[in-house]
């Protein structure tokens, strides 16, 4: 982790992510940019995403921790709070961000969002409508997309 212009906080958080990974989550910094992380989240058990391996990218802006990390899914996913570009609707990535939060908290919150989709605060209107009108069918579609796009690393 040789990047002397990185704030101590980012170095500490990165060391903790590597030495104490959260269950079902791996996050490793890019070799050429220590503010850019390659993330993998395993689909939570008993969710439509179970068995899936979801790739995400996380970037810490210059203003971090005063500004939230930028995170998006690289793996295609059928979820009311994630759009087709992989952007995530999560309050702590927007107006509820606090400098007290850490990268680890953000990743755990995204993992929790996979367990509990919220069609009442959607980023993808069509998927949210599908989820509200026929949840069982929407869950089946989410399982199918997980099988098609998120199986294997």
Curated annotation (Swiss-Prot):
Note from the entry: Partly functionally redundant with UBC36.
Any one GO cellular component localisation term in the record: UBC13-MMS2 complex
Catalytic reaction annotation: S-ubiquitinyl-[E1 ubiquitin-activating enzyme]-L-cysteine + [E2 ubiquitin-conjugating enzyme]-L-cysteine = [E1 ubiquitin-activating enzyme]-L-cysteine + S-ubiquitinyl-[E2 ubiquitin-conjugating enzyme]-L-cysteine
Function: Catalyzes the synthesis of non-canonical poly-ubiquitin chains that are linked through 'Lys-63'. This type of poly-ubiquitination does not lead to protein degradation by the proteasome. Mediates transcriptional activation of target genes. Required for postreplication repair of UV-damaged DNA and for adapting root developmental programs to suboptimal availability of iron.
Protein name as annotated: Ubiquitin-conjugating enzyme E2 35
InterPro entries: UBQ-conjugat_E2_core, UBQ-conjugating_AS, UBQ-conjugating_enzyme/RWD
Source organism (scientific name): Arabidopsis thaliana
Subunit structure: Interacts with yeast and human Mms2, with the RING domain of RGLG2 and with UEV1A, UEV1B, UEV1C and UEV1D.
Taxonomic path: Eukaryota, Viridiplantae, Streptophyta, Embryophyta, Tracheophyta
